[in-house]
Amino acid sequence: MPPTTPTDPGTPADVVTPADIEDAAARLKGVAHRTPVLRSRTLDALVGAEVHLKCENFQRAGAFKFRGAYNAVSRLSRAELARGVAAFSSGNHAQALALAARELGSSAVILMPEDSPRSKKDATLGYGAEIVTYDRYNGDRADIGARLAAERGLTLIPPYDHPHVIAGQGTAARELIEETGPLDALVVPVGGGGLIAGSAVAATALSPGIRMIGVEPEAGDDTRRSLAGGERVRIPVPRTIADGQAVEQPGELTFAVNRRLVESVVLVSDDEIRAAMRLAFERLKIVTEPSGASALAALLAGAVEPLPRRIGVVVSGGNVGLDRFLELMA
């Protein structure tokens, strides 16, 4: 049986609209957490600007991914829910989809890299999902995931390249700007591009003139290269501590949005990410995973130029095990 996908997938010309994000927000109300926005005088002084941190590390399943996963699964028919869902993910979408499926009375099968953090695998299993592993350096996860879904008749929910997922992710930026008012810039981690795409649609509607700035690890600069060249570029599997951003190529739909709405993508080193994680822990009293700290790292490293006056930063997740956190901080 061929894999099914949620209906009305949209087109690259009109992937997600502000109305789609409003609809997603209504679906997520009372289900997803309205995560806090953190301010710190210490951080403002270090950066030289007014910084507003949207703390998605406090989201259900530990990251922003729950927003998109729940929005997508909530749109499935009863028959699709009964058959179950599938996904490929390095960890955060895996946990999010497993939880969303459980909440909506469905089941989930997740394709994860063999070297995914143990904490992310354990959490995914804890939400009731089945895990199938693959070698991320020698296998194409999209192809393997599609075959897995086809063999089992499951609905495949991709981690970023679907309009319902993108719209769900955009609700985080919507909440942020509702709380802060207009911002001069929004700095967002970039993996496959779903978070910044949804954020850009929401933010440019609510705060006209806002600068959308993406952040990638130095080893995983596929979106930066793609935006510079005007077409999607594929790179070797990135080797970086930011496992949630170890993506080879931007999504087709996410790239269509981001090439239109994102001003620039800046890069940060693994050491700069570690430094941001340490500062978040020691001074802000929050735990972030490497990918979750990359946008903060860009500000602390002075990578965002010219420096805006009022800046929003998405702390995208906090799914890191204690042993791994201590190893990174050593």
Label for each model-derived stretch:
Residues 1-330:
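PLP-dependent amino-acid enzyme catalytic core
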